[in-house]
Amino acid sequence: KWAQEKGITGGIGNGLFGPNQPCTRAQIVTFLWRAAGSPEPKAMSSFADVSTDAYYAKAVAWAVENGITTGTGDGKFSPDATCTRAQSVTFLFRAIGKLVDSKAEFSDVLTDSYYANAVAWAVENGVTNGIGDGLFGPDNSCTRAQIVTFLFRAYQGK
């Protein structure tokens, strides 16, 4: 409900949200862009797989301009690829996070992994506490419910 009221997502159609559906890279950057107020990007991105008329085109351009993503290589963004929990928290961290002194205490988050600082920030700021049993689940698909929960917790009071 919060995400709908803030204009972050309108669901998947027919009055449905699809909470257990995996979230795509296009959806996540769009959610982040909308949470930031849908700022106009300076220029559109040059990814071969992002059409300028795609619903997520401005969001992708904004995400690139703000250092949230650089794509998946080979001039592509891979908008339809499912985002992992590690990627999702990293995108959110790059959008609004700040480095923290603590380390994430999950057995599946190595201190030298690209997402270690993002996970530490997310834990310290109450964005996530993992999936249980001392695990974060970095390679698990991030569901629509999870990313909206992460956003809600990160943007509380904003």
List each model region and its residues.
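Feature responds to low-complexity, polar/acidic, surface-exposed segments characteristic
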Residues: 5, 9-58, 65-86, 92-118, ...
